[in-house]
């Protein structure tokens, strides 16, 4: 981010601190007198699903109540300012949980099965309530999994990418993972950030799904990522004893129960046709292989 750092004005913030958030938003308003539109993107969250089972109260406070704090600050701004504010809330496909229909779109019923998803669902509905009840310009982006080279090291896709890099460099022999049979709809964060921005450029606010419309198992992601670096992975054994073995009969993937979630989301597959039609949203990274290639960069 060095190329844009001189243009940024960074502040410490905490979604559990209403006073601090209010001071920051009012400071932005004072420093930008005469602005036409003020766009606020709420991307802050405790976003690790498995960890949300370990710290459910914190997850609810930050991901759920934290969003309400922002909305309430916006609601109490002077009307002349409030009407210029546009608010984006980062929703998640995890809200669909044990899916009730496939593919999932804006009308699919939610069925969350993690503290993270439940907190995000509260934020989703509060965003709608403040839009419909107070006339605020608020929108929910229901984003399916989106990755990039900046993905956190404790997330599945980056664990695989970094693990392969470590295998190549000789720092480790295999990668240890959890459930490899769950299915996900993976896209690139660059495309999805473009979609977020497009949502706040519309005359009227609404909610939109961003997804690729393709789903792959974690197993397939592993195979394709290894293949990109010249490894051909096949599988031996079952359950916790299953291993991924390369073309030289060296074990490269093992399974550990500690990485399983208490409740597993088995299948996520999004339908972004509304965003494509109404926002003109298009994806640059249109295949899983292009995504993997960029994650190795």
Regions found by a protein language model. Name each.
Residues 1-146, 190, 200, 267, ...:
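N-terminal Rossmann-like NAD(P)+-binding domain of SDR-like oxidoreductases, especially those catalyzing
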Residues 13-16, 69, 153-297:
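C-terminal substrate-binding subdomain of Rossmann-fold SDR/epimerase-dehydratase oxidoreductases
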Residues 96-98, 149-151, 217-219:
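A short beta-to-alpha transition loop/helix N-cap that caps and shapes the active-site region
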